[in-house]
């Protein structure tokens, strides 16, 4: 999760997020090389005493500054498109969860079960216990099994919201009257935090998201307990 004075991304907890981090490093290196080249040319043009007032055109330079940007754009676009298709692909999900945004909390419904659903509210600061995080804890976590494809159907009951968990590399808009979907695979057990990422009113910053990834046997025990309590 995020920590004070953090400069980089959160640790990846899904294959898609790992791909996004690799693409970020790839694009950053290209931007760094371009910036270095442009800075060198600017310094060279300003500092040199050599000038030629009679050059009207240069076929070689025009070819270079046309072909080189095209190659750079291709080097950025191809891996970007690959990740885009990976994020959009949902093959044989083992579990489907419907996340519904409200002002200002989330509700979850496990559609593969007959009666498994709950509301998830932020834990007030005065009710926190040692080890919990202010503005990030919820009274009910969305529990999922690790190493399993999870599909999340996202919508909203009132206004625009956005369901986002950075460590899992997922962010999907919740639009009233529209059912969007996203998917992820939690590659390791853990607790992953997110927040509503679309301004939705006065308490927009007080509707956190908590995803807890557990081994399959623990998930089965949790789901059985939730069904018994329903």
Swiss-Prot record:
<dbReference type="GO" id="GO:0045277">
    <property type="term" value="C:respiratory chain complex IV"/>
</dbReference>
<dbReference type="InterPro" id="IPR008972">
    <property type="entry name" value="Cupredoxin"/>
</dbReference>
<feature type="binding site">
    <location>
        <position position="200"/>
    </location>
    <ligand>
        <name>Cu cation A2</name>
    </ligand>
</feature>
<dbReference type="Pfam" id="PF02790">
    <property type="entry name" value="COX2_TM"/>
</dbReference>
<dbReference type="InterPro" id="IPR011759">
    <property type="entry name" value="Cyt_c_oxidase_su2_TM_dom"/>
</dbReference>
<feature type="binding site">
    <location>
        <position position="198"/>
    </location>
    <ligand>
        <name>Mg(2+)</name>
    </ligand>
</feature>
<feature type="topological domain" description="Mitochondrial matrix">
    <location>
        <begin position="46"/>
        <end position="59"/>
    </location>
</feature>
<feature type="binding site">
    <location>
        <position position="161"/>
    </location>
    <ligand>
        <name>Cu cation A1</name>
    </ligand>
</feature>
<dbReference type="GO" id="GO:0005743">
    <property type="term" value="C:mitochondrial inner membrane"/>
</dbReference>
<comment type="subunit">
    <text>Component of the cytochrome c oxidase (complex IV, CIV), a multisubunit enzyme composed of 14 subunits. The complex is composed of a catalytic core of 3 subunits MT-CO1, MT-CO2 and MT-CO3, encoded in the mitochondrial DNA, and 11 supernumerary subunits COX4I, COX5A, COX5B, COX6A, COX6B, COX6C, COX7A, COX7B, COX7C, COX8 and NDUFA4, which are encoded in the nuclear genome.</text>
</comment>
<feature type="topological domain" description="Mitochondrial intermembrane">
    <location>
        <begin position="88"/>
        <end position="230"/>
    </location>
</feature>
<keyword id="KW-1133">Transmembrane helix</keyword>
<keyword id="KW-0679">Respiratory chain</keyword>
<dbReference type="InterPro" id="IPR034210">
    <property type="entry name" value="CcO_II_C"/>
</dbReference>
<dbReference type="InterPro" id="IPR014222">
    <property type="entry name" value="Cyt_c_oxidase_su2"/>
</dbReference>
<keyword id="KW-1278">Translocase</keyword>
<keyword id="KW-0999">Mitochondrion inner membrane</keyword>
<feature type="binding site">
    <location>
        <position position="196"/>
    </location>
    <ligand>
        <name>Cu cation A2</name>
    </ligand>
</feature>
<keyword id="KW-0479">Metal-binding</keyword>
<dbReference type="Pfam" id="PF00116">
    <property type="entry name" value="COX2"/>
</dbReference>
<feature type="topological domain" description="Mitochondrial intermembrane">
    <location>
        <begin position="1"/>
        <end position="14"/>
    </location>
</feature>
<dbReference type="InterPro" id="IPR045187">
    <property type="entry name" value="CcO_II"/>
</dbReference>
<dbReference type="GO" id="GO:0042773">
    <property type="term" value="P:ATP synthesis coupled electron transport"/>
</dbReference>
<keyword id="KW-0249">Electron transport</keyword>
<dbReference type="InterPro" id="IPR036257">
    <property type="entry name" value="Cyt_c_oxidase_su2_TM_sf"/>
</dbReference>
<keyword id="KW-0812">Transmembrane</keyword>
<keyword id="KW-0472">Membrane</keyword>
<feature type="binding site">
    <location>
        <position position="198"/>
    </location>
    <ligand>
        <name>Cu cation A2</name>
    </ligand>
</feature>
<feature type="binding site">
    <location>
        <position position="204"/>
    </location>
    <ligand>
        <name>Cu cation A2</name>
    </ligand>
</feature>
<feature type="binding site">
    <location>
        <position position="200"/>
    </location>
    <ligand>
        <name>Cu cation A1</name>
    </ligand>
</feature>
<keyword id="KW-0813">Transport</keyword>
<protein>
    <recommendedName>
        <fullName>Cytochrome c oxidase subunit 2</fullName>
        <ecNumber>7.1.1.9</ecNumber>
    </recommendedName>
</protein>
<dbReference type="InterPro" id="IPR001505">
    <property type="entry name" value="Copper_CuA"/>
</dbReference>
<dbReference type="GO" id="GO:0005507">
    <property type="term" value="F:copper ion binding"/>
</dbReference>
<keyword id="KW-0496">Mitochondrion</keyword>
<dbReference type="InterPro" id="IPR002429">
    <property type="entry name" value="CcO_II-like_C"/>
</dbReference>
<feature type="binding site">
    <location>
        <position position="207"/>
    </location>
    <ligand>
        <name>Cu cation A1</name>
    </ligand>
</feature>
<feature type="transmembrane region" description="Helical; Name=II">
    <location>
        <begin position="60"/>
        <end position="87"/>
    </location>
</feature>
<dbReference type="GO" id="GO:0004129">
    <property type="term" value="F:cytochrome-c oxidase activity"/>
</dbReference>
<feature type="binding site">
    <location>
        <position position="196"/>
    </location>
    <ligand>
        <name>Cu cation A1</name>
    </ligand>
</feature>
<comment type="function">
    <text>Component of the cytochrome c oxidase, the last enzyme in the mitochondrial electron transport chain which drives oxidative phosphorylation. The respiratory chain contains 3 multisubunit complexes succinate dehydrogenase (complex II, CII), ubiquinol-cytochrome c oxidoreductase (cytochrome b-c1 complex, complex III, CIII) and cytochrome c oxidase (complex IV, CIV), that cooperate to transfer electrons derived from NADH and succinate to molecular oxygen, creating an electrochemical gradient over the inner membrane that drives transmembrane transport and the ATP synthase.</text>
</comment>
<feature type="transmembrane region" description="Helical; Name=I">
    <location>
        <begin position="15"/>
        <end position="45"/>
    </location>
</feature>
């Amino acid at each position: 999760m995020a920590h004070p004075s953090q400069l980089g991304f959160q640790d990846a907890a899904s294959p898609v997020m790992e791909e996004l981090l690799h693409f970020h490093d790839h694009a950053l290196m290209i931007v760094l090389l371009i910036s270095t080249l442009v800075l060198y040319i600017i310094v060279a043009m300003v500092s040199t005493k050599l000038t030629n007032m009679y050059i009207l055109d240069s076929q070689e330079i025009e070819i270079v500054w046309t072909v080189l940007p095209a190659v750079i754009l291709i080097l950025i676009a191809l891996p970007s498109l690959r990740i885009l298709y990976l994020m959009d692909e949902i093959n044989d999900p083992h579990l489907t969860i419907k996340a519904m945004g409200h002002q200002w909390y989330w509700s979850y419904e496990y559609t593969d079960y007959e009666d498994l659903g709950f509301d998830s509210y932020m834990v007030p600061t005065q009710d926190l216990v040692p080890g919990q995080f202010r503005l990030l804890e919820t009274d009910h976590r969305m529990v999922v099994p690790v190493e399993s494809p999870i599909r999340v159907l996202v919508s909203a009951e009132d206004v625009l919201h956005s369901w986002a968990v950075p460590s899992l590399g997922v962010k999907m808009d919740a639009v009233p009257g529209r059912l969007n979907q996203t998917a992820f695979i939690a590659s390791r057990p853990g607790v992953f935090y997110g927040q509503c990422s679309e301004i939705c009113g006065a308490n927009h910053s007080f509707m956190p998201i908590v995803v807890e990834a557990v081994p399959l046997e623990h998930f089965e025990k949790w789901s059985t307990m939730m069904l018994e309590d329903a």
